[in-house]
Amino acid sequence: MGRALVSMVLGATAAATLLIVALWISSEVLITRTYPIAPEVAQAAPAHAVAEGRRLSKLYGCTSCHGADLQGKVYNPNPRLVRNYAPNLTLAAARYSDEQLAQAIRQGVRPSDGRALWGMPAQTLMHLTSEELAMVLAFVRSHSPAGASTPPESAGWRARWAVLTGALDEPRRVARAQATPAMDLGPKLAAGRHIASTVCSECHGSDLGGDDVEGGPDLRAVGAYDAQAFDTLMRTGVPPGGRHLGIMTLVARSDFKVFTQAEVAALYAYLSARAEWLTAAD
């Protein structure tokens, strides 16, 4: 009986070990796979590009991940998920052309080999206009190469499982976002829709209907805000009632403070109209 039990335990241990190895190898194949890279055309930057590029880099979260000096930093230190190192952009700018940087930003792939840039919100940044992208790149190139290269990212078990199940599939998020864009409510609300697509969709989903991965709710909730309450939310992260909204509160205080009054007004006009349309359609 004792020998049989030992054999069973050893057999189960061996089977579990083989399963773990198989899952690790399978996830590594998916993580290191390469993707086709579409050509990008870079636009010449306007005269005011660096100053506006600095503001846009803050608004789009570039400096939140890559650091105020753009020299890179750890932005997800959880070893069970993914230890992400946002790369040193001052070194990347010296190595890549504007067209290649545009490929990384809009397609979420590394120009040198076509591998996925894990954590790069290309599904949101793909909406940048050529002029917006040119200004961001002008700001990046205003920094001389400095600092060290960041270490490669390290995927933990939770991330590997998410890759195997399809929950994490970075480049394909771009295709999914293209297939499910934010609702088009006409030219008068186009400016607000563009802001929602380039800023809000990272956490709230490409169609703004909520995102299970990032945790952002359906922005239909904006229908409960008046213009003043929404302005307060965007600038302080505090909703009516004073609740702490987690990452929304943090991002509003760190990044959204650079929104112009016109941008907040345009965003509110679009999101409130979207909420009204969805309510009427129910």
Positions of predicted regions on the chain:
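Solvent-exposed, polar/charged alpha-helical surfaces in well-ordered, non-transmembrane soluble domains
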Residues: 51, 55, 87, 99, ...
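Sec-exported extracytoplasmic/periplasmic mature domains
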Residues: 58-61, 67, 94, 106-110, ...
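C-terminal functional regions that serve as terminal interaction/effector modules
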Residues: 225-281
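Gly/Gly-Pro-rich "capping" loops immediately C-terminal to redox-active cysteine motifs
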Residues: 43, 54, 68-102, 117-129, ...
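Disulfide-stabilized extracellular ectodomain repeats and their linkers
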Residues: 62, 86, 117, 197-200, ...
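Sequence/structural segment immediately N-terminal to covalent heme-attachment motifs in c-type
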Residues: 46-78, 165-173, 184-208
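Post-cleavage N-terminal segment of exported redox proteins
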Residues: 1-48, 104-113, 131-187, 237-240, ...
